[in-house]
UniProtKB/Swiss-Prot annotation:
It comes from the Archaea. This is A-type ATP synthase subunit I. The gene is atpI. It is a multi-pass membrane protein. It comes from Methanocaldococcus jannaschii (strain ATCC 43067 / DSM 2661 / JAL-1 / JCM 10045 / NBRC 100440). It is found in: Cell membrane.
Length: 692
């Protein structure tokens, strides 16, 4: 129930052998390299070692990665693959390329060879496609500008500067046109003509295209003034004919460009199909080599050696030592020691049984344990599954969840580790829900009663009815009677069970916290933070047990009262130590906090009722519609059932997941768990497209 024990690995390696060592460690993936740059700032270490930097070959590798990435981006842009529902629901594992390289130079040579071959085939079409795209973009912009001038029939070749006059085109906001004409006439001393076309909308503004003609000697004044009126100038050059003729010519050019583009794209698609897998493998190999080269920057070095430090799980320590020594052909000194750093700096690796391991993701969602802290995953699993089943509590919903979980686990989980874990968790949660659904007689709520007149909860097939009386629990046959309290229906029984389970759940957390404090030598904290609450819960069980045995209520209440007072005094003492009298007074309120934690487990009943109640409402509504509307009512009723139960399943399934986690994260973990550990991050070659 604790993270894997770690060892500190320290090694001095001959510089000629460092590449072999790094490659071996990277492939094996059992150590986490330590960055020594901060340590080497220390004066004592500075005299022994100097900081290392990334390997020289990293620059070359990075350049090749950029080139490969650019081609992959181009392949991706031209061959946008359509993903079918079948591909999403049943993804195929990636076919990996087998590779065998013994040095970075071999990888670089291979990458250069492949990239050169691809470039010979791809560069020409890709460059031409880029040219066409640029030309198309310019033509589309030109087309837009000329289209605004369509009502002004003049030869566009005259736009620009002539021997004596300048002709310009553009657009201005409609409301400024009148003022513009007046002001330009002033600054041009009347030597200007302005012609306007049909208005159009652009950027939510009504604009008007204009063409103006002025003497060249007046142009500077005109341009200076026209800018004040939000004038948007049209850059139309090397175009002949009227706007209509020019637009027709542009359309022809665009069609020709599109035809050539399509031909080039088809050619590049074929090249993508031919080279993409190979290129993805190349990119991955280069990424791996870059990671290896960058790792050098974490080392220390002398003239002829490298010094490395790493974290390694204790179970793999000897394996890592042998790996380094063998890779260095014996030219290495390796030392394995116990950690001497604060626990916050020691990486955490969780190690649970296979059936529990997927649930580690739920622990990580909260926080990883510190190195010397308890791993709560094993404690979380039974509570999470039990609470989930109680909250969703419908056998049909549970069966559906199990099927969905199995599908995610076995299908999508083949290509996604996260989906694999989630699918496994949902499968077990679904099984738990089926069991709880059978216990409570929940089969799409009261579907069997509403449509077939068969009330499962009134038969021996169901132990308890969340919405009322059942065969086993009713007015004539109460679950139990304690003083004036008589449990004669399902909701009351489930509430009592929820509080009981909550007390047990908290008790387990308190025992773990007590044990941890004792182990650390914090006896005072163990008693104040956990011990008094353990005694209080036990006193509640003893008091209730005595009442069941027929003891006087005053005696049972007195026993519980004694430990309530003890808990208040302990909380006040704790508050006084931390902040004086005021904190002591506030500390007395911890008892109400404890009560709040216990009552929080009543949410088990709340979600149980929500699931069953909403399912019942859907069934009643569907039945009423089906019976009151001839023929079509049956179809509508089926739609109501499908939509209503789907909504209920999704919403309460999600709610059960969230609230089950909340009971652990807030109520349970707060009794013993702090978290805040640093995840073990192995120096490992991540291979998706290749296998060594």
């Amino acid at each position: 129930m604790r993270p894997v024990r770690m060892k500190k690995l320290k090694a001095v390696i001959l510089d000629e052998k460092i590449d072999n060592v790094v490659r071996s460690l990277h492939e094996e993936g059992i150590v986490e390299l330590c960055d020594l740059s901060e340590k080497l700032e220390d004066l004592e270490w500075k005299t022994l070692l100097s900081p290392s930097s990334s390997a020289d070959y990293v620059r070359n590798v990075t350049s090749l990665m950029i080139k490969a990435g650019r081609i992959l981006d181009m392949f991706s842009s031209v061959s946008q693959k359509e993903t079918s529902i079948k591909d999403i629901l049943n993804p195929k594992p990636v076919e990996k390329k087998k590779v065998s390289f013994n040095s970075y130079q071999e990888v670089i040579d291979y990458a250069e060879k492949v990239l050169n071959e691809i470039s010979k085939e791809v560069d020409g079409p890709a460059e031409r496609l880029s040219e066409l795209d640029n030309k198309k973009s310019k033509l589309l912009q030109l087309k837009e500008q000329i289209s605004y001038l369509k009502g002004l029939e003049f030869d566009l070749k005259y736009l620009g500067s002539g021997e004596y006059v300048f002709i310009g085109a553009g657009s201005v906001p409609k409301e400024k046109l009148g003022e513009l004409k007046a002001e330009l006439d002033k600054v041009a001393d009347g030597y200007i003509g302005i012609f306007s076309g049909s208005e159009f909308e652009k950027d939510k503004k009504i604009r008007v295209p204009i063409v103006f003609v002025t003497l060249k000697e007046k142009l500077e004044n005109v341009l200076s003034e026209i800018r004040k009126f939000e004038f948007e100038r049209y850059d139309i050059s090397d175009v002949e004919g009227t706007p209509s003729e020019a637009l027709s010519k542009i359309e022809s050019e665009l069609k020709a460009i599109e035809s050539e583009r399509n031909s080039l794209i088809e050619k590049l698609k074929a090249l993508a199909q031919k080279w993409e897998k190979e290129l993805l493998a190349v990119y991955e190999l280069l990424s791996i080599e870059k990671a290896r080269g960058d790792a050098y920057s974490q080392f220390g070095k002398t003239d002829r050696t490298y010094y490395i430090e790493a974290w390694v799980p204790a179970r793999d320590a000897e394996k890592a030592k042998s790996l380094i020594e063998n890779s260095a052909d014996g030219f290495a000194f390796v030392e394995i020691t116990e950690p001497d750093e604060p626990e916050e700096k020691i990486p955490v690796l969780l190690d649970n049984p296979k059936v529990i391991k997927p649930f580690e993701m739920l622990t990580e969602m909260y926080a990883l344990p510190k190195y010397n802290e308890v791993d709560p995953t094993l404690l979380l699993v039974p509570g999470f599954l039990l609470f989930y089943g109680i909250m969703l509590t419908d056998a049909v919903y549970g069966l559906l969840l199990t099927i969905i979980g199995l599908f995610i686990w076995k299908k999508i989980g083949k290509v996604s580790e996260g989906a694999n874990k989630l699918g496994y968790i949902l499968t077990l949660a679904g099984i738990s829900t089926v069991i709880m659904g059978i216990i409570t007689g929940g089969y799409l709520g009261d579907f069997t009663y509403e449509f077939f007149g068969f009330d499962v909860t009134k038969t021996p097939l169901a132990l308890v009815n969340p919405l009322g009386e059942s065969y086993y629990i009713n007015n004539n046959n109460p679950l139990f009677t304690l003083g004036s309290i008589s449990v004669t229906n399902g909701p009351m029984a489930i509430l009592v069970f929820s509080i009981f389970v909550g007390l047990i759940h908290l008790l387990i957390g308190l025992f773990v916290g007590f044990k941890e404090n004792v182990k650390r030598g914090n006896m005072g904290d163990a008693f104040i933070n956990q011990g008094v609450w353990i005694l209080l819960i036990l006193s509640i069980f003893v008091g209730i047990g005595l009442m069941f045995a027929g003891a006087n209520t005053m005696i049972a209440g007195g026993i519980i009262g004694i430990f309530v007072v003890l808990a208040i005094l302990a909380s006040m003492y704790k508050g006084y130590k931390s902040g004086g009298v005021m904190e002591a007074i506030l500390g007395a309120m911890d008892v109400t906090g404890f009560l709040g934690n216990v009552l929080s487990y009543a949410r088990l009943l709340a979600l149980c009722l929500a699931t069953g109640g909403l399912a019942m409402a859907v069934n009643i509504m569907a039945k009423l519609v089906g019976e009151s509307i001839p023929v079509i009512g049956i179809i509508v009723a089926i739609i109501i059932l499908l939509v209503g139960h789907t909504f209920n399943f999704v919403m309460n399934g999600l709610g059960a997941f969230i609230h089950s986690l909340r009971l652990h994260y807030v109520e349970f973990f707060s009794q013993f768990y702090e978290g805040g550990g640093k995840k073990f991050s192995p120096f490992k070659a991540n291979r998706e497209y290749t296998t060594a």
